[in-house]
From Swiss-Prot:
One GO CC annotation: mitochondrion
Oligomer status and interactors: The glycine cleavage system is composed of four proteins: P, T, L and H.
Matches recorded under InterPro entries: 2-oxoA_DH_lipoyl-BS (IPR003016), Biotin_lipoyl (IPR000089), GCV_H (IPR002930), GCV_H/Fam206 (IPR033753), GCV_H_sub (IPR017453), Single_hybrid_motif (IPR011053)
Record keywords, A-Z: Lipoyl, Mitochondrion, Transit peptide
A matching Pfam family: GCV_H
Location(s), subcellular: Mitochondrion
Function: The glycine cleavage system catalyzes the degradation of glycine. The H protein shuttles the methylamine group of glycine from the P protein to the T protein.
Cofactor(s) essential for the protein: (R)-lipoate
Domain of life: Eukaryota
Residue ranges constituting the Lipoyl-binding domain according to the UniProt record: 53-135
Protein name: Glycine cleavage system H protein, mitochondrial
Native source organism of the sequence: Flaveria anomala (Yellowtops)
Main location, first listed in the record: mitochondrion
Amino acid sequence: MALRMWASSTANALRLSSATRPHFSPLSRCFSSVLDGLKYANSHEWVKHEGSVATIGITDHAQDHLGEVVFVDLPEAGGSVTKATGFGAVESVKATSDVNSPISGEIVEVNSKLSETPGLINSSPYEDGWMIKVKPSNPSELDSLMGAKEYTKFCEEEDAAH
């Protein structure tokens, strides 16, 4: 795993934890966007649940604080993830941060494009920059995640505290 270096208290606080092209309009924020229709973890991962599959990635807010992403460490398909535990890492020019899963389940697909083009997380965090797709083992875990308005408020409060 990549060498851990924490460049700022904000990056240190990020615990990062995947979706196919959501077609929602973003809520306006001063430097990042939050999409309506997704669920968000306080560790700055998003989840899009469609049918039996949930896609997971890191939020625009998280990638904005990390800066240019230069490397992504992801697990293999067929493995499993547990809610609130790490499944990979994102290395940027500023820091390396763990990526946590907001839900538990079996990994059914990994975004292999990220190994060649990790910057997709910066340019398209909610579309091309998704990380993993999971078959949730406990779909009720989604109920504990935040909606867009809640997550926007959470980010504003977190940023104000730093």
